[in-house]
Regions:
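Active-site neighborhoods and metal-handling regions in enzymes and metal-associated proteins
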Residues: 1-394
Length: 394
């Protein structure tokens, strides 16, 4: 394991070797010479870190080239060299001067991958995460190697990545404890007269000082009996007033890069009836769906049960993303989404997953949101946060 003090929480050598062994099993089963994948950021770039324990950052692409019979080769921008002591299972890093905003530099990045595939004489090449591999890369590879078969191995890699080892769950639980501490501090931070972005800045500072690696914070406030929504940073300029209520969503990773999510409503004084009623439905809806987090269940069944529950009580149904697994990625498979003619999640719930469930109810009079992480055991789900369910009264 890395012992350099510059890394907050390195993953162990044993854990990396476990992952590599699983990948090599997949390559052997699929008769594939190698697999490649890309990432460009931390909150949705988990493939790269899962293979290497090195995050992709700042929207600069990082490419992992993983052969079936050798150590990895990495492709990175020459603007961000990796120290030698941080490399494990890596034979070499190939650097090139590229940046996604410099359209003409894409060929420099692509050339690293072309040269590697050609040098290996690969005939069957796997890839994972097609939504992360940019068009210049795939177009060039398909044109340059017309006789090479490119195989999507995303499902196979995702199935392994979704099941958390004991060490990975240690990281996830540490992140949950960090969230718990931020929520405990919230009443001392939020006060009337502050801009929403100032509250956000204090929360980010606190999480960072406790070891968090990346912080996405959604925050909205409004007068009672109106909707506050859940604004992103661009729309967090409102000044908080006495008597307001709000929604706070923390999408914050801990030391080691594992994500959790947590959300609660808060209110200056007692909430109005419409807000209090909707919040209670959120609590009940999450309890219902958490009870359904059992091995073998399709996630689409959980979404259907949730939508039926809230619709019967007169609230909006979820048409986007009700829940999902988490790890190095903020959103991992399986996703909890409604049936869609263009494609559905086919990964079932399994023991060892760490899932986020987030009932969200909004109308003209209120916005309520509850979010917690649950670890799936053979006997059902275990909530890993200790935040009280009650709305926070300030």
């Amino acid at each position: 394991m890395i012992t350099n003090e510059r890394v907050r929480r390195p993953i162990s050598d044993q854990e990396l070797e476990r992952r590599w062994a699983e990948v090599r099993k997949i390559l052997a089963e699929k008769e594939t010479d190698m697999i490649f994948l890309q990432g460009s950021n931390m909150h949705l770039g988990g493939y790269v870190r899962w293979f290497t324990d090195i995050p992709a950052e700042y929207n600069y692409n990082m490419t992992v080239l993983f052969p079936a019979d050798d150590e990895m080769t990495l492709g990175r921008s020459s603007a961000s060299p990796v120290p030698a002591w941080a490399l494990r299972g890596v034979r070499e890093i190939k650097y090139a001067p590229f940046c996604p905003t410099l359209n003409y530099s894409a060929e420099s990045e692509v050339g690293l991958v072309v040269d590697f595939i050609r040098s290996r004489g690969a005939k069957r090449v796997g890839y994972a995460g097609k939504a992360f591999i940019h068009s210049a890369m795939m177009l060039s590879l398909l044109h340059t190697f017309p006789d090479v078969e490119f195989v999507d191995l995303s499902n196979e890699i995702d199935a392994v990545k979704a099941l958390k080892s004991d060490e990975e769950m240690e990281c996830a639980r540490a992140t949950a404890r960090l969230h718990d501490a931020v929520w405990e501090a919230l009443p001392a931070i939020v006060r009337p007269g502050m801009k929403e972005y100032q509250i956000r800045a204090e929360l980010v500072r606190l999480a960072t000082n406790m070891g968090s690696e990346e912080q996405l914070v959604f925050l909205g406030t409004a007068p009672q009996n109106t909707s506050c929504g859940m604004p992103t940073f661009q729309y967090q300029n409102r000044t908080v007033q006495e008597g307001d209520y709000g929604v706070l969503l923390l999408e914050v990773s801990g030391p080691g890069g594992y994500y959790c999510e947590s959300s609660r409503n808060f209110s200056f004084g007692e909430p109005c009836k419409k807000l209090a009623d909707a919040y209670q439905v959120c609590i009940e809806a999450q309890a219902l769906t958490a009870s359904m987090l059992t091995p073998g269940r399709p996630s689409i069944e959980i979404v259907a049960a949730y939508n039926k529950f809230v619709a019967e009580r007169g609230y909006c149904q979820e048409g986007r993303l009700f829940g999902h697994s988490q790890g190095y990625d903020l959103v991992e498979r399986p996703a909890f989404m409604c049936e869609d003619s263009r494609g559905n999640e086919d990964m079932v719930i399994r023991e060892g997953m760490c899932c986020s469930l987030h009932p969200y109810l909004t109308d003209d009079f209120q916005t309520t949101y509850i979010n917690d992480n649950f670890y799936v055991t053979k006997n059902g789900a275990e909530r890993i946060h200790t935040i009280p369910y009650e709305m926070i009264i300030l």
